[in-house]
Amino acid sequence: MRKMSDLNRSQTVLLVDAMGLYLRHFVAHPAMGKDGQHVGGIIGFLTDLKKIVERFNPNPVYVIWEGGGSPRRRAIFKDYKSHRRPERLNRFYEDDIPNTVAGRDNQVKILVKLLKLTPICQVYVPDCEADDVIGYMSRYHFKDALKIILSADKDYYQLISEGSIIYSPTWKKLIQEQEVVDRFGVHPVNFALAKAVCGDDSDNIPGIEGVGFKTLAKRFPALALDTSVTLQELLTEASHKVESGSKVQAYKNIADNEVLIQRNLSLVTLDTANLAAYQIKRINDICDNFKPSRNKIEFIRALLNEGIQTFNVDQLFLALSHIQTS
């Protein structure tokens, strides 16, 4: 497995799950602007981004925003992510909770404006989840580069390989193949299949009753190997166990639920199946045609206009100084 010390930094691409990084700071970072407005999402996002760029010196850097969800997934399963609720700031209580939806969206607008003044490329594809965009960029557009995906979302574990590594802002560490195997008993190459079987409460995807990652890994040890296991192979193995007289309920539950697992696999897999041709073209065009630029003075002015006086702009721009501008 390639180690970080072996990286050719000129070939290291940083892919940032923008809303994932932003929301963890929006709900927890207490920073306020000079007029008392909450700006924690902005400051936390920029601070984490600066630290990651300083540590890994990636070039280029892409910040990928959510595009309003996936109509294709909702067509497959109408209840997909239907339980999601607006984020709430964790330091307000009862009736004192402000309009967090408005506050969240306003800070995102400010962040988008600020990032335009840096040599960072922002990617937004309508009717598309950031997961799919990052999946495409990682698997295809930057196939031969080393990718670092900045996200705490386990959905991206299926992308981990010798050429793709995840940096978790929650754990403050790199997540590589062995970490996934050690924690889940499943290799990243089989992570999407395992998730299709076990389900995902965070996305409102029901799994097979009585089957979690621990049970699945125990009953199907081949999932821990660096070899892709197909759904049909999994079903065949489960059916064989049942026919051989196994009393383990997990085998029967899996063997009897091919349709559910196949549907879930369509929902959780990050590949081109959930992207339209025009969306793929948009991703390619953005990546190929972006011309980095920087405007530090305007960046400072924009921060001051929002009452943000505590962020160290010099450090951010120094961290990004290795990215050549047009």
Explain the meaning of each model-derived region.
Residues M1, C128-R139, G185-K195:
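Short, motif-level signal for alpha-helix interfacial/capping segments enriched in acidic residues
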Residues V108-K109, A152, A192-V197:
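Intrinsically disordered, low-complexity segments enriched in polar/charged residues with Gly/Pro
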